[in-house]
């Protein structure tokens, strides 16, 4: 509950929450860049999920204008039953955005900014449904380019002695140790 409250504060522009968030972003980005360097990778832009938090209102407006949003238990969803998928949650009942909302904002930002031919999402296979839902919502908004341009590349998990790795449980292997 405390984490949700802080996230809501951040989404509503609370200065203390944003300062704490920025501190975490800076530390995380420094560590990510170190890992990327070990892999021989570098990026021109580092725009994390939180970069898109102020762009979610536009996503909600697009969905409202297209009559795609429905209320469900106080939350806002896009019904995807017709496509054999559960609903795509867009806004929680407290008005906060979620991953899908920010991923939609990221897609529209990236398409407008870079006019990509392909946008690849390389994530764990457990996010397969999430990206299928998000990509379908982009299509439902009349963006035919989404069918061929948005690609999810799922990967498996590294396990330790047959158990799933989890930072919360302390069962972890650091990428730097493997590399």
Question: Model segments located where?
Answer:
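NTP-dependent nucleotidyl-transfer catalytic core
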Residues: 1-179
